[in-house]
Design a protein with these regions (language model features):
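C-terminal "post-core" interaction segments
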Residues: 1-249
């Protein structure tokens, strides 16, 4: 039998951060990150940027088929689902961002192929939940679209995505030679889609607490520099900064 919905309340009143917020997501965002994103979107708390998320809002538990014989295997049972304040689940559908960005991985080759996804029915919406006023993102979306249309990296992603879709649906005789050739074509396209983390687009600085911690570990210092380089040369992060700046103004 279906149990009554349980409303999860915030036992820590107040906010740790109340400033402008941008959340980057894509189809690999699932589970906890989707729950957080969904809440932020429902409450109009921040701008969701990127591409539609995976779409998982269910909870599972793994149990042995036979507790006395572990070798008999295990089974995974779905025991519950998460809903937003309006009584709807993002399971299977995912969360659509407020501002969509080109995604080189968002191809039909990566599209979900589940023929019988787990259907989560709606439940009664929560009552008397105060939310922030709509953010009013029309100008932000328009400005972002213009920037991405003129961005060489994003333009290349759109072109390569079309090529990848064509290659994925290509038919060929199943021979070892053809399979190897097809594999080489795919890996070649994937390498072209990869972002070159070499040219910094902006400056990334460490927080004072991070600087203090890094004093005592040279390996972490090197790793930290690599992370900063990747962030400073990532076009998605750069566009998110533009959006955050527009949103703040």
């Amino acid at each position: 039998d279906q149990e009554e919905p349980i409303i999860l309340k915030d036992f820590n009143r107040g906010a740790a951060y109340s400033g402008p917020l941008v959340i980057l997501v894509n189809k690999y965002s699932a589970s906890a990150s989707e729950l957080f994103t969904n809440v932020m979107k429902d409450y109009n708390r921040g701008v969701i940027v990127g591409s539609t998320t995976y779409g998982k809002s269910t909870m599972q538990v793994v149990l042995p088929v036979n507790e006395d014989e572990p070798k008999d295997g295990f089974m995974k049972l779905t025991t519950g689902a998460f809903y937003n304040i309006y009584g709807k689940s993002h399971n299977e559908k995912g969360i659509t961002p407020d501002v969509e960005l080109p995604d080189g991985t968002n191809t039909t080759a990566h599209a979900p192929s589940f023929t019988q996804p787990f259907e989560v029915p709606d439940v009664q919406a929560a009552s008397r939940i105060p939310v922030n006023a709509p953010l009013g993102l029309d100008n932000i979306i328009s400005s972002s679209t213009k920037r991405t249309m003129n961005n060489d990296v994003f333009k290349k992603m759109n072109l390569q995505r079309e090529k990848f879709d064509q290659l994925f649906h290509k038919s060929f005789d199943l021979t070892l030679e053809n399979v190897f050739k097809h594999y080489q074509e795919i890996t070649s396209l994937i390498s072209e889609l990869e972002i070159s983390y070499t040219d910094a687009l902006f400056t990334v600085e460490d927080h004072e607490s991070t600087t203090e911690i890094l004093k005592y570990n040279s390996i972490d210092q090197e790793y930290n520099e690599e992370i900063k380089l990747q962030l400073s040369s990532d076009p998605y992060v750069q566009e998110s900064i533009h959006i955050l700046t527009n949103f703040n103004n």
